[in-house]
């Protein structure tokens, strides 16, 4: 499971970039928009590998932006929050370890599923991402939705202890 998270979320983007980058460098232009997640900065409990793979993608995005800027290539990451898709019903769940954590894993996942079902429509997220892709200049990172923008800024600016407490209250299944 852990390897699959990184294969899709990190290496999928890195390998795609590796394939297109020579053409972008040759043309001295291009835009790379990586799809991250607010989990990259929120470090969501019981979503360790997902959060870590998205954090790796954001770090990669920042490094790459500095490497290719002089070729006229811009790189950005988008941090969606919950999006209402069929992913929720297709999620493979395991009760392994739930007893060790006092049932907090299943409570946390149930809360995430509720949030996903109330999340934004995929079309809304897609429109937002398309607008970013077409901007003249891009910021390093964009969060989608006011709640997630606030959460992203809070996670990046507040002390880790505050971030961990807030994220823990939201997602730890207590």
Region spans (language model):
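Substrate-binding pocket helix/loop in short-chain dehydrogenase/reductase
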Residues: 1-3
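Active-site helix of classical SDR
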Residues: 17, 53
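A short helix-coil junction within the Rossmann-fold of NAD(P)-dependent oxidoreductases
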Residues: 19-28
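Residue(s) in the substrate-gating loop at a strand-loop-helix junction
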Residues: 37
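Active-site-adjacent segment of SDR/Rossmann-fold oxidoreductases
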Residues: 42, 63-73
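Active-site loop immediately N-terminal to the catalytic Tyr-X3-Lys motif
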Residues: 42-48
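SDR active-site lid
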Residues: 70-139
């Amino acid at each position: 499971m852990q390897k699959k998270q990184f294969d899709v979320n990190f290496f999928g983007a890195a390998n795609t970039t590796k394939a297109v980058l020579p053409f972008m460098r040759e043309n001295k232009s291009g835009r790379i928009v990586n799809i991250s997640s607010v989990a990259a900065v929120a470090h969501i409990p019981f979503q360790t590998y997902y959060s870590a793979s998205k954090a790796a993608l954001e770090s990669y995005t920042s490094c790459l932006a500095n490497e290719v800027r002089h070729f006229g290539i811009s790189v950005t990451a988008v941090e969606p929050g919950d999006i209402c898709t069929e992913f929720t019903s297709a999620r493979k769940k395991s009760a392994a370890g739930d007893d060790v954590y006092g049932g907090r894993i299943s409570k946390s996942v149930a809360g995430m599923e509720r949030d996903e079902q109330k999340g934004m429509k995929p079309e809304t997220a897609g429109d937002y991402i398309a607008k970013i892709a077409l901007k003249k200049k891009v910021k390093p990172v964009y969060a989608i939705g006011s709640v997630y923008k606030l959460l992203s800024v809070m996670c990046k600016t507040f002390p880790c202890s505050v971030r961990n407490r807030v994220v823990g209250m939201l997602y730890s299944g207590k």
